[in-house]
A protein has these predicted regions:
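Acidic/His-leaning functional-site neighborhoods
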Residues: 43-46, 50-57, 61-68
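Residue-level marker of beta-strand positions
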Residues: 63, 93-94, 112
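Short acidic-glycine-tyrosine-enriched beta hairpin
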Residues: 84-104
């Protein structure tokens, strides 16, 4: 099962610093189409080991097909409301999904979420 939310073009993100602090002004990163109507991502961080952090904007009424990720998925709802097969979530809610968990995703009124993917 493929991941429908991968960016459709190259990812320019922040690198993890060897020491000190790294900084990325997210306004310098463009929103990218994902190949799933109504879902756009803004990649922020990606490591060689497979860790990735991104913002995802979900348009009102958008719903994904069933899919799974081969990583742990953490979702923090920043704005609006978000739903999957199990629950509905509001701003401030945190969702953690196991690798391989098949699910859909969507929003009735629109949402902005922070996604973090980590190797299992």
């Amino acid at each position: 099962m493929s991941d429908p939310f991968q960016p459709t073009r190259g990812v320019t993100t922040l690198d993890r610093p060897a020491s000190g602090t790294a900084y990325l002004n997210q306004s310098s990163v463009d929103w990218q189409e994902t190949g799933t109507t109504g879902f756009e991502t803004k990649p922020l961080y990606q490591s060689a080991s497979g860790e990735m952090t991104m913002l995802m904007k979900i348009a009102p009424g958008a719903v994904s097909e069933a899919h799974a990720h081969d990583t742990v998925e953490e979702i923090y709802v920043l704005e609006g409301s978000f739903f999957d097969d199990e629950n509905s979530y509001e701003a401030g809610d945190l969702i953690i999904r196991a690798p391989g968990a098949v699910h859909t995703a969507g929003s009735k009124s629109g949402a902005l979420v922070l996604l973090k993917f980590s190797p299992a």
